[in-house]
A protein has these predicted regions:
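Short alpha-helical DNA-recognition segment
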Residues: 46, 147-162
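Recognition helix of helix-turn-helix/homeodomain-like DNA-binding domains
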Residues: 158-173
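DNA major-groove recognition helix of helix-turn-helix/homeodomain DNA-binding modules
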Residues: 177-192
């Protein structure tokens, strides 16, 4: 078992390095997140283009808790979420095709390279079906040039008038079979490229919006923040304990545990700084009565606001008033 785990860790390290090399090649500023150490974590890399990356050897091996964390973080920090792995269900991922794990986009390093090169990575898999990303403006123009009504085109490709209307609005995309019929009629010009941010917003953000109130009802701290007008979620597998937002103002809270040690608290803060430097959020470290080492605190004060736990509610009220 230990040998298997070691091999998996080695493969993950290779994928991580490949991913970082690709990001560097495309002049993207990225940071590795290293908390929690030696345990499963939901965030491995953050990128300044508002992208959160989880690395896995096989996308199916990533736990539900990590997936949930990744979804919550992406919504609260207004970022695209993507899993980079080599395989899914022990099958090699196909270059140029974006797969899906619980509504999060999955791709191999080669597809990430193509995507960042502005190549037409157009095929993606969601909820049991393959789709092709269509350029709605080009489709509309081609249809008008051919003097076809929405209904006429719908009949030609075997779909509904409403579906064609949604393709042109880019509110939905056709299946591979339907896309092939459109390409035969109008050419490759109507094919576009996926946008990781759009896919995350379309498939992940709606889910998070639905569960925000449920989470707030179950947790006293989140309920208090919700009543103040702060959308917030608790994260379990990464550095910040809570991330929240008031309109476009994003906030990360790192909360000191009564029985935790200073080193762990500092490590959480340092990794939260990395996340927020790339994704744009203010950081508040909430201290228990134990406090934190004076020297460590001094080194972090330029990037973090420290607040005593009993003053947290006052701080949150001030954030809402701003």
């Amino acid at each position: 078992m230990r040998r298997t785990s070691s091999i998996r860790d080695e493969r993950i390290a290779v994928i991580l390095r490949k991913t970082l090399d690709i990001l560097k090649k495309h002049n993207m500023d990225a940071d590795i997140i290293e908390y929690p150490r030696g345990e499963r974590r939901s965030v491995d890399i953050v990128v300044n283009k508002r992208i959160i990356i989880k690395i896995g050897r096989d996308a199916s091996e990533i736990s539900r808790e990590e997936i949930e964390d990744l979804k919550l973080a992406s919504k609260m920090l207004d970022s695209a979420a993507v899993i980079i792995s080599e395989t899914y269900l022990n099958e090699d991922l196909e270059p140029g095709v974006v797969m899906d794990r619980s509504d999060i986009s999955v791709m191999d390093p080669e597809t990430l390279d193509l995507y960042l090169s502005n190549e037409k990575v157009a095929i993606y898999y969601k909820r049991g079906h393959f789709f092709v990303k269509i350029n709605g403006v080009a489709l509309h123009r081609k249809r008008i040039e051919r003097m076809l009504s929405l209904g006429e085109l719908a009949e030609m490709i075997g779909t509904s008038r409403k579906a064609v209307y949604e393709y042109e609005r880019e509110a939905m995309d056709p299946s591979i079979e339907t896309a092939q019929k459109l390409i035969e009629l109008f050419g490759e010009e109507i094919v576009s490229r996926i946008d990781l941010h759009e896919l995350t917003e379309r498939y992940v953000y709606g889910y998070v919006n639905k569960i925000l109130k449920i989470h707030a009802q179950e947790d006293p701290m989140l309920r208090k923040m919700y009543e103040m007008g702060i959308e917030a979620v608790k994260l379990k597998r990464t550095a910040p304990d809570i991330v929240g937002r008031i309109e476009d103002q994003k906030t990360a809270l790192v909360i000191q545990r009564d029985r935790g040690d200073d080193n762990e608290m500092v490590e959480k803060i340092v990794n939260t700084i990395k996340i927020c430097a790339k994704l744009g959020c203010e950081i508040y470290a909430v201290l228990s009565n134990r406090g934190i080492d004076r020297e460590a605190k001094k080194k972090l004060e330029d990037n973090v606001t420290f607040v005593e736990r009993e003053k947290l509610e006052h701080l949150l009220k001030n954030l809402v008033r701003r």
